[in-house]
Regions:
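ATP/NTP-dependent adenylation/nucleotidyl-transfer catalytic domains that generate, transfer
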Residues: 1-262
Length: 262
């Protein structure tokens, strides 16, 4: 385990809970642990590009992710190692990653693992390991999914991914039926209504399906230059494998199908 260099890089949005969980997990797993705060480096970068640190726009958020990738790449060079990417299939489908930030690595181990499966894997591994590692993984499993790029509110996570882009259980369902089977939008929606009728309203399902198609099309440019990664399931978005799509493809025809009332 000591050959694995695990790095935590706290910045503006890092909560004490997630920081402590990362430190506890590294200790429990026995890996080499490093803490590299990037706040000062990002603030200096803001000065260099004349960005007001109070302007919490895309540059404010993405600069943190790109600074972290810079740190990881250079640590990897020093350690004569490679950067292992943490991004998963759901994030790639939605483009929920910073271009040349967490989007980039030297090998993406989770590239074909959807977020819902990630949750199951964490739960399984927590039970298998038990002890301190199991307790931390259990806590991580019940922590809101967040990139933590915006400052916390009262010490708690302010930026909650599933409130912004939609529930991952829906997006993974949409992705599977749209990509694996090539079903049209109206059929994907029909199946979602049958599968989730006890949990989500028809309007909610339609809303997040529209968002899925909008993001899936507009974010293809990030998938066109992915690091290598392993294919695990039946769906892959690698441009070198199962998925080839022009980055300027238009989602309009798919979205129009969802405007048609049954």
């Amino acid at each position: 385990p000591k050959d694995i260099v695990a790095v935590t890089m706290p910045c503006f949005g890092t909560t004490d809970k997630t920081l402590q969980n990362s430190l506890k997990l590294m200790e429990a797993l026995g890996v080499t642990s490093r803490t590299v705060p990037v706040k000062d480096a990002v603030l200096q970068h803001f000065k260099d590009i004349s960005h007001d640190e109070n302007n919490k726009n895309a540059a404010y958020e993405n600069a943190q992710a790109r600074m972290r990738t810079l740190v990881l790449m250079d640590i990897a060079n020093d350690a004569n190692g490679i950067v292992i990417g943490t991004g998963d299939l759901s994030e790639l489908a939605l483009g929920w990653a910073t271009y040349n930030g967490d989007h980039m690595s030297m090998y993406g181990v989770n590239a074909s693992v959807p977020k819902t499966l990630v949750r199951h894997l964490i739960a399984y591994e927590g039970k298998r390991l038990g002890g301190a590692a199991g307790a931390v993984l259990e806590d991580i499993l019940h922590t809101e999914i967040s990139p933590e790029l915006l400052p916390p509110e009262d010490g708690k996570i302010a930026q909650k991914t599933e409130e912004l882009v939609g529930p991952y259980e829906l997006h993974d369902f949409y992705l599977y039926h749209a990509v694996r089977w090539g079903f049209p939008p109206e059929k994907v929606l029909y199946l979602a209504k049958a599968a989730f009728k006890e949990k989500y309203s028809d309007d909610t399902l339609r809303k997040w399906l529209k968002n899925f198609y909008r993001r899936f099309f507009s974010q293809q440019f990030k998938r066109s230059c992915l690091p290598d990664g392993v294919k695990i399931g039946s769906v892959s978005l690698s441009p070198r494998g199962d998925w080839r799509m022009p980055s300027d493809a238009e989602s309009r025809l798919w979205l129009e199908k969802l405007e048609e009332k049954p």
